[in-house]
Amino acid sequence: MTARILSIGTATPPTTIAQDRIRDFFAQQPDCDRLTQRLIRATFDAAQIERRHTVLPELGDAGGDGIFVDAQGMLRSPGTALRNAEYIRLAPELSRRAAQAALDEAGVAASRITHVVTVSCTGCFAPGPDFRIVRDLGLAPSTERYHLGFIGCAAAFPALRAAERFCAAQPDAVVLVVCTELCSLHIRPSASPDQIVSSSVFADGSAAAVITADAAERPGLDLERFGTTLTSEGEKDMAWTIGDDGFEMVLTGEVPRIIGREIRGAVDSFLAGDVPTAWAIHPGGRSILDRVQAGLELAPEALHASRAVLRDYGNMSSATVMFILRELLRDDAVQDGATIAGLAFGPGLTVESALFTKRIAPITPAADAERHLAVAG
């Protein structure tokens, strides 16, 4: 039986920041000379982001004296321990909200969850996010727990792949996948082009999905297959390391160009001739979407959902592609039986791929069996 995403729930912090405001905030920092200010303004304006969410209220319109910003509006540089303490304080509640939204939308009781898979690369602790989901949602103590940490923006698809395999091994499994990222906890003043690019796109958010192989359940997205491609270049161009003053992002200008060169081969190998109806492309940034669109010769409307999520939420690392899938799941223009190809990019440089089929009408067990026989043939 085919595993299916029954629902996707999302949650964002209450503080929203407009792109032009956060652009001016970074440009006014005391270590910015005129050249850096011009680079900040050009980078932020080219991002095609209008707003983002953050767990840092001092970055909002009201401002204020906080851990990350002083009373004069200057960025502080808290150490990694303090940043991670904020992650431990704030991430579990955001995860709980997204997970509860997914359960409510699916109409699935918490007691039915058999497996939990959590994903995050912006903080760490033990007992970790997987433990907190079980405790905070009142799941059974016997719930199997798994955490995918520090994989980066591409981690949602490996988590969904794990869920699909749990369902294949245990047909009555009901898996809860939760991706939560608090990227803004690692902001810092810097004239480095890599850091300026990171500051211009990254944001905070959480997304959760309920997955089961029970074909009698409600409509959703069938998990058809997954793929991974490790490119021959890019190991030093996209990286995520732990420093003394937070986690440090390496994101060079070569990343979009590498993706542009590699994407056709990776996608052709994965799709093997299939032509998707719709696309869910992780918007690592506007230039990455542009390169994917050009490399795959896609029409502009093919990336509508990806660009809309980038515009309204920014890059929430692993959670972002789940927001895009949620948009496509709710989009009436994406009809029953439509195939959706998903792509996400992470350090390595790694391309994670996924193929989904949208199901508006529940598929019967007999039809599901016939579909698998057709694929096997």
Specify the residue positions occupied by each region the protein language model found:
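Active-site-adjacent elements of ketosynthase-type condensing enzymes
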Residues: 125-131, 176-197, 227-243, 286-294, ...
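Conserved beta-ketoacyl condensing-enzyme motif
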Residues: 43, 47-138, 274-289
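Condensing-enzyme catalytic core mediating Claisen C-C bond formation in acyl metabolism
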Residues: 1-86, 174, 183, 189-261, ...
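Short coil/turn connectors at secondary-structure junctions
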Residues: 1-2, 110-114, 141-144, 169-175, ...
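Active-site glycine-rich loop that binds ribose-phosphate moieties when present
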Residues: 141-143, 148, 158-162, 179-204
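Claisen-condensing/thiolase-fold acyl-transfer catalytic domains that form or cleave C-C bonds
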Residues: 103, 121-123, 135, 140-142, ...
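Short, well-ordered amphipathic alpha-helical segments that serve as non-catalytic structural scaffolds
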Residues: 45, 49, 90-105, 162, ...
